[in-house]
Amino acid sequence: MRFVFDEVFNSDTDSPEFEETCSTTSSTSSQCPTPEPSPAIKLPSFTKVGTKKLVNESVVILDPALENALRDLNLQSKLIPINEPIVAASSIIVPHSTNMPLPRASHSSLLDNAKNSNATAPLLEAIEESFQRKMQNLVLANQKEIQSIRENKRRVEEQRKRKEEEERKRKEAEEKAKREQELLRQKKDEEERKRKEAEAKLAQQKQEEERKKIEEQNEKERQLKKEHEAKLLQQKDKLGKAVTNFDKISKMFWHYKDKIAQIKQDIVLPIKKADVNVRNLLSRHKRKINPKFGQLTNSNQQLFKIQNELTQLINDTKGDSLAYHWILNFIAKAVVHQAETEVRVKPESALPLGKLTLYLLVQFPELQELFMARLVKKCPFVIGFTCEIDTEKGRQNMGWKRNNENKWEDNTSYDERMGGILSLFAIITRLQLPQEFITTTSHPFPIALSWHILARICNTPLNLITNTHFVILGSWWDAAAVQFLQAYGNQASKLLILIGEELTSRMAEKKYVGAARLRILLEAWQNNNMESFPEMSP
């Protein structure tokens, strides 16, 4: 540590005990390169000091820390000893910068005076006092620096702790969020598991209920079937002895032909002039109903679904009588069309179509007359009607169609269409009523109608019998022979032998393909290999 004399000596310039007694500057002997004047040294007035008796000052006890600091500074080594000669110099150079080393100055005259005048004690006291003040300032500055360092360390430590606390809280928040997310995921998984279990349980219960319902329905059908067979047995003698009245059949045929004309006059044409809202409603329903028949499968579940949808669509039109009959007529046409297109190539499809048709016939009684009229128009064999086809009118009455070239369709196409329609009719006659209608409604197309068809064809004049008659008999056999035997027993067996053996023998010379197939079916039955359409699945 270095001290600048101007700081030491000039610190108390205002003290009355000091005055300027000498000047150490010399313009001739100064070797200082700076043009600035050298500072003056203010010393106590020797005249006053010399005459004034020094007062013994009390000993100052320093703080141990300060005393150690002073000892470390070794100030004694930095002061000029009293008895050491001082190299003469023309002037004392005191640098303005406190960072520059203090050059040695020559004060031989001053020291000599100090020695001689015994005035060194006050000077030393002044120096010591000034030095103590400087040291106190240094101590205070050091204390402030230490305090500042401690404060900085405290702030740094607080900041570190704050960051650590924030990091800890952040990690805790993240962990908490993760735990909450995990709990939420587990909760969702548990809810999903419970939902699936509930759905599976509900589906199982529903299947069990449906199974029980089907079993109960089958049991009731078996009981009703027995009762129905008992009633049929009472009628079989009358039916066996009945004589075919072709005049009555002809009147029935023309009745349904007239019904077709009436439908056109009273239902179809008026709808074209009806309110636009009604026409729009029917148009929408028509587009919805058309594909329903093609969606039928061998599944009862699918059948029930389509039944409900069609029932709802029909009920929507009940508010308007004209619209209601129009939609029923449209459904009758659609069913017959499905029979002559789909059933002709896939006869077993007649079973779901027949079940749907029977349900609609019972649910909407107004449909029965409309449906029968459409059947007779397309296939008069359903009532046992036959006429000559060597005329234009005769072919039209028997349901022949013209192709795109305005020519009559070929025999194969005609036979297939008739077989498809009669398969549907035979299925309807041998089906039991839906469970909900058994006790309240009679069968609209009972199995007795199948007896009528067979008996009337057997009684038809041989000159009117064609291959088509044998084709439709074969279609009927596939669809209803098993149930016919169950219904009429021994009388049914006699009638089957009549059409399968005697009628085919009478027409043997014609070599009809349909007759040959009918004999094959007869032989299969006689060999206990009679087959029927497979029952529908649940």
UniProtKB/Swiss-Prot annotation:
UniProt short sequence motif Bipartite nuclear localization signal 1, positions renumbered to this chain: 154-170
Coiled coil ranges: 131-244
Lineage: superkingdom: Eukaryota
Matches recorded under InterPro entries: GLE1 (IPR012476), GLE1-like_sf (IPR038506)
Function of the molecule: Functions as a component of the nuclear pore complex (NPC). NPC components, collectively referred to as nucleoporins (NUPs), can play the role of both NPC structural components and of docking or interaction partners for transiently associated nuclear transport factors. It is specifically involved in a terminal step of poly(A)+ mRNA transport through the NPC probably by binding the ATP-dependent RNA helicase DBP5 and GFD1 at the cytoplasmic side of the NPC.
Membrane topology term: Peripheral membrane protein
Chief location bin: nucleus
CC annotations in GO: cytoplasm; mitochondrion; nuclear envelope; nuclear membrane; nuclear pore; nuclear pore cytoplasmic filaments
Subunit details: Component of the nuclear pore complex (NPC). NPC constitutes the exclusive means of nucleocytoplasmic transport. NPCs allow the passive diffusion of ions and small molecules and the active, nuclear transport receptor-mediated bidirectional transport of macromolecules such as proteins, RNAs, ribonucleoparticles (RNPs), and ribosomal subunits across the nuclear envelope. Due to its 8-fold rotational symmetry, all subunits are present with 8 copies or multiples thereof. GLE1 interacts with the NUP82 subcomplex via NUP42. It also interacts with GFD1 and the ATP-dependent RNA helicase DBP5.
Effect of L358A: Partial loss of activity
Gene3D superfamilies: GLE1-like
Compositional bias ranges of the Low complexity kind: 21-33
GO biological process, one term: mRNA processing
Keywords, in A-Z order: Coiled coil, Membrane, mRNA processing, mRNA transport, Nuclear pore complex, Nucleus, Protein transport, Translocation, Transport
UniProt protein name: mRNA export factor GLE1
Family stated for the protein in its record: Belongs to the GLE1 family.
Additional comment: Present with 1040 molecules/cell in log phase SD medium.
Region (Interactions with NUP42, DBP5 and GFD1): 257-538
Signal peptide per UniProt: none
